[in-house]
């Protein structure tokens, strides 16, 4: 650890404590993520180490770069590039108003990062505004990519804060264990709606049951025809047959018609029907968008 000088604690992440630090040789500012390991554990699971070392190969401008992995018997510290703030803090500072072009730019960058990782068979599985980081140039970067695979999908933060269910798709809420890239696309849809509403979450459920009710009240409870595999999921239980909201106009009033169409394609209850990151980037919503 002598290579890095800790400057300040930034916060408690899902997996441990995060510090702002400086590389003593290059003076580069980095984020140190100290991963907490269970006391009764034999140190770092080799599977976790393998996964994490793969993440060093994910090099893309919309992915937070993992510079280094420091590993001692009981400690694992991940050294990431430093970003000024996350999307949640950004929402707090924009006072309920977000320029439609910024919404489009952030979603485009989110999809670019997702498409890159998905093409390499890496899923995020725990996307939310807190792990979308934004730097001073308005560049959005996905953080904590692949950590859910290395350490397991978090059920609660180690700081006892409950991990949010707000961005989890219905198939996962019904106990699906086989994930595909579609898990991240649902989360991207929830984040898109939150961007369009300048930080108001789309489905702020209190627990799994409340979460599913909120989703079905908006999108309609899926029938067996619409989603044949639903009733086979481990935690499936029937819900009232809520009708779908006819239009998303009232849900995301500031989003134009093509934006609403893209949102509907992301928020499909049946994971098979969800649009992919590559398909989403080709959607007409982006036809007039010039990437910086």
Curated annotation (Swiss-Prot):
The active site is at 126 (proton acceptor). Its EC number is 2.7.11.1. This is Cyclin-dependent kinase 5. GO terms for cellular component: axon; cyclin-dependent protein kinase holoenzyme complex; cytoplasm; cytosol; dendrite; filopodium; growth cone; lamellipodium. GO terms for molecular function: acetylcholine receptor activator activity; ATP binding; cyclin-dependent protein serine/threonine kinase activity; ErbB-2 class receptor binding; ErbB-3 class receptor binding; Hsp90 protein binding; kinase activity; p53 binding. It is found in: Nucleus; Cytoplasm; Cell membrane; Perikaryon. Keywords: Acetylation, Apoptosis, ATP-binding, Biological rhythms, Cell cycle, Cell division, Cell membrane, Cell projection, Cytoplasm, Kinase, Membrane, Neurodegeneration, Neurogenesis, Nucleotide-binding, Nucleus, Phosphoprotein, Serine/threonine-protein kinase, Synapse, Transferase. CDD domains: STKc_CDK5 (cd07839). InterPro entries: CDK, Kinase-like_dom_sf, Prot_kinase_dom, Protein_kinase_ATP_BS, Ser/Thr_kinase_AS. Residues 4-286 form the Protein kinase domain. It comes from the Eukaryota. PROSITE patterns: PROTEIN_KINASE_ATP (PS00107), PROTEIN_KINASE_DOM (PS50011), PROTEIN_KINASE_ST (PS00108). Proline-directed serine/threonine-protein kinase essential for neuronal cell cycle arrest and differentiation and may be involved in apoptotic cell death in neuronal diseases by triggering abortive cell cycle re-entry. Interacts with D1 and D3-type G1 cyclins. Phosphorylates SRC, NOS3, VIM/vimentin, p35/CDK5R1, MEF2A, SIPA1L1, SH3GLB1, PXN, PAK1, MCAM/MUC18, SEPT5, SYN1, DNM1, AMPH, SYNJ1, CDK16, RAC1, RHOA, CDC42, TONEBP/NFAT5, MAPT/TAU, MAP1B, histone H1, p53/TP53, HDAC1, APEX1, PTK2/FAK1, huntingtin/HTT, ATM, MAP2, NEFH and NEFM. The lineage of its organism: Eukaryota, Metazoa, Chordata, Craniata, Vertebrata.
